[in-house]
Amino acid sequence: MKLIFFVKDGCGVCENAKEKVDFFLEKWNARESVDVETVNLSTSDGLVEAAMRAVAEIPTIILEDTTGEVARWMKKAPPSEDLRTRLGV
Protein backbone atom coordinates (compact mmCIF):
# COMPACT_ATOMS: atom_id res chain seq x y z
CA MET A 1 0.00 0.00 0.00
CA LYS A 2 1.08 3.56 -0.60
CA LEU A 3 -0.14 6.84 0.90
CA ILE A 4 0.51 9.97 -1.13
CA PHE A 5 0.16 13.32 0.64
CA PHE A 6 -0.41 16.38 -1.53
CA VAL A 7 0.60 19.40 0.55
CA LYS A 8 1.78 22.98 0.22
CA ASP A 9 4.40 24.96 2.15
CA GLY A 10 2.89 26.71 5.17
CA CYS A 11 -0.27 24.58 5.25
CA GLY A 12 -1.03 23.86 8.90
CA VAL A 13 -3.89 21.51 8.05
CA CYS A 14 -1.49 19.54 5.83
CA GLU A 15 1.04 19.22 8.64
CA ASN A 16 -1.64 18.12 11.12
CA ALA A 17 -3.03 15.53 8.70
CA LYS A 18 0.41 14.04 8.09
CA GLU A 19 1.17 13.95 11.83
CA LYS A 20 -2.14 12.18 12.52
CA VAL A 21 -1.55 9.54 9.86
CA ASP A 22 2.07 9.05 10.98
CA PHE A 23 0.85 8.56 14.56
CA PHE A 24 -1.62 5.85 13.58
CA LEU A 25 0.80 4.06 11.24
CA GLU A 26 3.21 3.84 14.16
CA LYS A 27 0.46 2.80 16.62
CA TRP A 28 -0.75 0.03 14.29
CA ASN A 29 2.80 -1.14 13.48
CA ALA A 30 2.02 -0.48 9.82
CA ARG A 31 5.00 1.75 9.04
CA GLU A 32 6.90 -0.98 7.16
CA SER A 33 3.92 -2.14 5.12
CA VAL A 34 2.87 1.33 3.92
CA ASP A 35 5.02 3.54 1.70
CA VAL A 36 4.48 7.24 2.35
CA GLU A 37 5.19 9.84 -0.31
CA THR A 38 4.79 13.61 -0.03
CA VAL A 39 4.10 15.77 -3.08
CA ASN A 40 4.64 19.49 -2.49
CA LEU A 41 2.40 21.70 -4.60
CA SER A 42 4.75 24.62 -3.92
CA THR A 43 7.04 23.12 -6.60
CA SER A 44 6.51 22.84 -10.34
CA ASP A 45 6.98 19.05 -10.19
CA GLY A 46 4.37 18.88 -7.45
CA LEU A 47 1.91 20.90 -9.51
CA VAL A 48 2.40 18.57 -12.47
CA GLU A 49 1.86 15.48 -10.31
CA ALA A 50 -1.26 17.04 -8.77
CA ALA A 51 -2.66 17.88 -12.21
CA MET A 52 -2.05 14.32 -13.43
CA ARG A 53 -4.01 12.98 -10.45
CA ALA A 54 -6.77 15.62 -10.53
CA VAL A 55 -5.82 16.98 -7.10
CA ALA A 56 -7.47 20.37 -6.55
CA GLU A 57 -7.58 20.65 -2.73
CA ILE A 58 -4.93 20.51 -0.04
CA PRO A 59 -4.29 18.45 1.77
CA THR A 60 -5.31 15.52 -0.40
CA ILE A 61 -4.30 12.06 0.71
CA ILE A 62 -4.50 9.20 -1.78
CA LEU A 63 -4.26 5.55 -0.81
CA GLU A 64 -3.10 3.21 -3.58
CA ASP A 65 -2.58 -0.50 -3.88
CA THR A 66 -1.19 -2.46 -6.83
CA THR A 67 -4.38 -1.90 -8.83
CA GLY A 68 -4.50 1.88 -8.36
CA GLU A 69 -6.37 4.36 -6.19
CA VAL A 70 -8.28 2.81 -3.30
CA ALA A 71 -9.37 5.93 -1.42
CA ARG A 72 -9.00 9.71 -1.43
CA TRP A 73 -9.45 12.17 1.41
CA MET A 74 -9.48 15.93 0.85
CA LYS A 75 -9.06 18.95 3.16
CA LYS A 76 -8.47 16.78 6.25
CA ALA A 77 -6.85 13.64 7.58
CA PRO A 78 -8.72 10.42 6.96
CA PRO A 79 -10.84 9.15 9.86
CA SER A 80 -8.61 6.68 11.70
CA GLU A 81 -11.04 3.75 11.54
CA ASP A 82 -11.60 4.26 7.80
CA LEU A 83 -7.84 4.34 7.20
CA ARG A 84 -7.29 1.29 9.40
CA THR A 85 -9.96 -0.71 7.60
CA ARG A 86 -8.62 0.21 4.17
CA LEU A 87 -5.07 -0.67 5.21
CA GLY A 88 -6.25 -3.96 6.66
CA VAL A 89 -4.39 -3.51 9.94
Where are these regions (language model features)?
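Local sequence-structure signature of Cys/Sec-based thiol-disulfide redox active-site neighborhoods
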Residues: M1-A30
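Thiol-based oxidoreductase modules, predominantly thioredoxin-like and allied folds used
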Residues: K8, A30-G46
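Short alpha-helical
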Residues: G12, D45, P78
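Non-catalytic interaction surface on structured domains
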Residues: V21, S33, I62-T66
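Structural micro-motif
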Residues: R53-I62
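Non-catalytic, surface beta->alpha helical segment in thiol-disulfide oxidoreductase systems
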Residues: L63-V89
